[in-house]
UniProtKB/Swiss-Prot annotation:
This is Envelope glycoprotein gp160. Keywords: AIDS, Apoptosis, Clathrin-mediated endocytosis of virus by host, Cleavage on pair of basic residues, Coiled coil, Disulfide bond, Fusion of virus membrane with host endosomal membrane, Fusion of virus membrane with host membrane, Glycoprotein, Host cell membrane, Host endosome, Host membrane, Host-virus interaction, Lipoprotein, Membrane, Palmitate, Signal, Transmembrane, Transmembrane helix, Viral attachment to host cell, Viral envelope protein, Viral immunoevasion, Viral penetration into host cytoplasm, Virion, Virus endocytosis by host, Virus entry into host cell. Highly glycosylated by host. The high number of glycan on the protein is reffered to as 'glycan shield' because it contributes to hide protein sequence from adaptive immune system. Palmitoylation of the transmembrane protein and of Env polyprotein (prior to its proteolytic cleavage) is essential for their association with host cell membrane lipid rafts. Palmitoylation is therefore required for envelope trafficking to classical lipid rafts, but not for viral replication. Residues 132-152 are annotated as: V1. Belongs to the HIV-1 env protein family. InterPro entries: Gp120_core_sf (IPR036377), Gp160 (IPR037527), GP41-like (IPR000328), HIV1_Gp120 (IPR000777). Residues 34-697 are extracellular. Residues 153-196 are annotated as: V2. A motif (YXXL motif) lies at residues 725-728. Residues 369-379 are annotated as: CD4-binding loop. It comes from the Viruses. The lineage of its organism: Viruses, Riboviria, Pararnavirae, Artverviricota, Revtraviricetes. CDD domains: HIV-1-like_HR1-HR2.
């Protein structure tokens, strides 16, 4: 029993040794390296932005055309070598209905119209009663319908002399007149101009030329424009083929209603855009893939008369007839190819059915407008400065029966067999502005023939009722919201801001300066990554984008920088034309915004201690909650920088605050370290070059003490005098000679009697000064000697303490070494015993197996003998 207990005790001791060894090894094996936040500059990361865009155009500086004048003052010249960089493997969301570029273009075109068609006079409306009769004409046909809508009105106006009136005549459209309920009127022919009391009229004179030229919208420095190149893209949703440009393509700011003129064509299929194309009262924007030529003509000439109304005047068409004058100067017409137009409507219907996923046969009707203001119920556009109003009833008079996704079985339209279609138009002076909703009177039509060639590139439609998948559906032309036209031109653009940096976790950290251990670590190289430019590696993973800067990088960066530099040089070259107008201020804001963004980003990097570094390691420990479901390997191998930046967008401000706090602490540590470094220059105090400075300080101290002593003496004298004492005069010491011996003296003093002696210095100022100096010198000497003695004793104590500390440290190290040696020996013994036990067990098992095999073998070997013995027994 005693032997068994000893064996168990020995086994328990070995087990405890094994447990301790495992406890020491498990933390080492389970250790995972800490991740730290690292700032990367120049990574392909962006976010949507709304900066102030500026325009570029190829304006003719010598032209007097109003659009050229406006473009030369508001826009910079275009870049002769524009660059477009495709982004591989990059997808991004676009939304034309929330694109601020549309709003900015809308404001710009308003500014263009305000400047190009700027009125020269401002006057109140002709609020007078007029007697109007139908305009007599012998013409018949389509154009006569427009003439029949006009009235010949006569009215009285006030001349410069207020007490004198004069009768005038002018032509007005019926839609611009309101009948007056006057009992004295004959046959109810008294009229007045509509809204004459509520509208301020701006009259444009003289007539100006107005021909739109293409305008390019450009992003300022630090921003870029994404362009979607998907063929089936409709302005909303995810785009898979994206490229980066600095400026858009040339956009012609043509203003029109119902039809889109001179716009951007769809590349393959007809493009249909809308917030909800199956609802009624929602605009459906159609962009054709083939242009349809339309030519508008106004024939004839006319004279213009001035009608004075007091100190002002109003210009109108005269009724004087001559060989070359005609009241038909306000009548025009437009021609187009009916076959091409009919095919465009049919393809629009088929494309619409594909978008709404229609499976059954339906009937689609294109009908005339439902009415409204003349600008909405007609095709309204500007041609050579004249305002055209065209009736499009003939263009939208088609019915497509039994239509499917592939085609329509029957088409019902106009019965005319003529290949070219014609729509009547009229020119008007009284125009309701699409910009501010106010009415304006412009000068009468200019004389001569007017011809405008335009391309129909789209149309704006509305459903009468919500989409009916089993019955008829009617589409009508609408207009009025010019933003729909700008959307067809800007649907595939969006502006983004290039982020200067991003944050990601790495295993490298910034060396922390500790005031107790001021040793600086050498920064590790890490990934050694330099990026291929701002957006050239946008589609690559974070790890793949981290490659060395190559020649391709220089070319990409050089291209982007050169393009921005070209634009800025163009702005600088045109500064004399960019006046301090709205556009001049906008150009200045665009440049200042880019500069402010750059300064703000550089300031943030400076505060983080990352100035001039592409990769900036920090001492901020990465929180695993920031990464979410991603680990370190999946971040660098599976995500792009854009995806990663969107993932940490909600916590980026927290990370930035942590980096800022860590940098502040780092600066405090540096300050404390520098203060500690000052003690290292203690031995410089004994430098011979500083002795003169020490002597000067000593002289100043002694002089100050003497001065204080003199002041105290003077104050003491003043005090004594006030108390009634008289100060003694200064006495000069004189030698004292021995007096002659008097009779009766025995000369008991002895010695040399004839030697002179000095008596003690009588009390006075010099004696007091000498005493003070002697006292100060002795005090200084004793003070310095005591200080040196104290320092020596302190050094002795420090040395003794350091020696004792060293002895203790050595003893502790020896003890630790002995303990470690003991535990290592125990581990070695435990391992040896374990191996011995395993060997003995294996040997026992091996011996048992061998013995069993031997017995089995012997059994097989004894089989013949047993058979022989059995046979012998049987035979016996």
């Amino acid at each position: 029993m005693t032997v068994t207990m000893k064996v168990m005790k020995k086994n328990n001791r070995k087990s405890w040794s094994l447990y301790i060894a495992m406890a020491l090894l498990i933390p080492c094996l389970s250790y995972s390296k800490q991740l730290y936040a690292t700032v990367y500059s120049g990574v392909p990361v962006w976010e949507e932005a709304a900066p102030v865009l500026f325009c570029a155009s190829d304006a003719n500086l010598t032209s007097t055309e109003q659009h050229n004048i406006w473009a030369s003052q508001a826009c910079v010249p275009t870049d002769p070598n524009p660059h477009e960089f495709p982004l591989g493997n990059v997808t991004d969301n676009f939304d034309i209905w929330k694109n601020y570029m549309v709003d900015q273009m809308h404001e710009d075109i308003i500014s263009l119209w305000e400047q190009s068609l700027k009125p020269c006079e401002k006057m109140t409306f002709l609020c007078v009663q007029m007697n109007c009769v139908d305009l007599q004409t012998n013409k018949t046909g389509l154009l006569n319908e427009t003439i029949n809508e006009m009235r010949n009105c006569s009215f009285n106006v006030t001349t410069v002399l207020t007490d004198k009136k004069e009768q005038k005549q002018a032509l007005f459209y019926v839609s611009d007149l309101s009948k007056v309920n006057d009992s004295n009127a004959v046959n109810g022919t008294t009229y007045m101009l509509t809204n004459c009391n509520s509208t301020i009229i701006k009259q444009a004179c003289p007539k100006v030329s107005f021909e739109p030229i293409p305008i390019h919208y450009c992003a300022p420095t630090g921003y870029a424009i994404f362009k979607c190149n998907d063929t089936d893209f409709n302005g909303t949703g995810l785009c898979h083929n994206i490229s980066v440009v600095t400026c858009t393509h040339g956009i012609k700011p043509t203003v029109s209603t119902q039809l889109i003129l001179n716009g951007t064509l769809s590349r393959e299929k007809i493009r249909i855009m809308g917030k909800n194309i199956t609802e009624s009262a929602k605009n459906i924007i159609v962009t054709l893939n083939t242009p349809i030529n339309m030519t508008c003509i106004r024939e004839g000439i006319a004279e213009v008369q001035d009608i004075y109304t007091g100190p002002m005047r109003w210009r109108s068409m005269t009724l004087k007839r001559s060989n070359n004058t005609s009241p038909r100067s306000r009548v025009a017409y437009c021609t187009y190819n009916k076959t091409v137009w009919e095919n465009a409507l049919q393809q629009t219907a088929i494309r619409y059915l594909n978008l709404v996923n229609q499976t059954e046969n339906v009937t689609i009707i294109f009908s005339r407008t439902s009415g409204g203001d003349a600008e909405v119920s007609h095709l309204h556009f500007n041609c050579h400065g004249e305002f055209f109003y065209c009736n499009t009833s003939g263009m939208f008079n088609y019915t497509f029966i039994n239509c499917t996704k592939s085609g329509c079985q029957e088409i019902k339209g106009s019965n005319e067999t003529n290949k070219n279609g014609t729509i009547p138009c009229k020119l008007r002076q009284l125009v309701r502005s699409w910009m501010k909703g106010e009415s304006r009177i412009y000068a009468p039509p200019i004389p001569g023939n007017l011809t405008c060639h335009s391309n129909i590139t789209g149309m704006i439609l509305q459903l009468d009722q919500p989409w009916n998948s089993t019955g008829e559906n009617t589409l009508r032309p609408v207009g009025g919201d010019m933003k729909d036209i700008w959307r067809t031109k800007l649907y595939n653009y969006k502006v983004v801001q290039i982020k200067p940096f991003s944050v990601a976790p790495t295993k490298m950290s910034r060396p922390i300066i500790n005031i107790h251990t001021p040793h600086r670590e050498k920064r590790a190289v890490g990934l050694g990554m330099l990026f291929l430019g701002v957006l050239s590696a946008a589609g690559s993973t974070m790890g793949a984008a981290a490659t060395a800067l190559t020649v391709r990088t220089h070319s990409v960066l050089k291209g982007i920088v050169q393009q921005q530099d070209n634009l800025l040089r163009a702005i600088q070259a045109q500064q004399h034309l960019l006046r301090l107008s709205v556009w001049g201020i906008r150009q200045l804001r665009a440049r200042l915004q880019a500069l402010e963004t750059l300064i703000q980003n550089q300031q943030r990097l400076n505060l983080w201690g990352c100035k001039g570094k592409l990769i900036c390691y920090t001492s901020v420990k990465w929180n695993t909650s920031w990464s979410g479901r991603y680990n370190d390997d999946s971040i660098w191998d599976n995500l792009t920088w854009q995806q990663w930046d969107q993932h940490i967008n909600n916590v980026s401000s927290i990370i930035y605050d942590e980096i800022q706090a860590a940098q502040d602490q780092q600066e405090k540590n540096v300050k404390a370290l520098l203060e500690l470094d000052e003690w290292a220059s203690l031995w410089n105090w004994f430098d011979i070059t500083k002795w003169l400075w020490y002597i000067k300080i000593a002289i100043i101290i002694v002089g100050a003490l003497i001065g204080i002593r003199v002041i105290m003496i003077i104050l003491n004298l003043v005090k004594n005098i006030r108390q009634g004492y008289q100060p003694l005069s200064l006495q000069i010491p004189v030698p004292h000679r021995q007096e002659a011996e008097t009779p009766g003296r025995t000369g008991e003093e002895g010695g040399e009697g004839d030697r002179p002696k000095w008596t003690a210095l009588p009390p006075g100022f010099l004696q007091q000064l000498y005493t003070d100096l002697r006292t100060i010198i002795l005090w200084t000497y004793h003070l310095l000697s005591n200080l040196i003695s104290g320092i020596r004793r302190l050094i002795d104590y420090l040395g003794l303490g350091l020696w004792i500390l060293g002895q203790k440290t050595i003893e502790a190290c020896r003890l630790c070494g002995a303990v470690m040696q003991y535990w290592l020996q125990e581990l070695k013994n435990s391992a040896t015993n374990l191996l011995d036990t395993i060997a003995v067990s294996v040997a026992n098992w091996t011996d048992g197996i061998i013995l069993g095999l031997q017995r089995i073998g012997q059994g097989f070997l004894h089989i013949p003998r047993r058979i022989r013995q059995g046979a012998e027994r049987i035979l016996v």
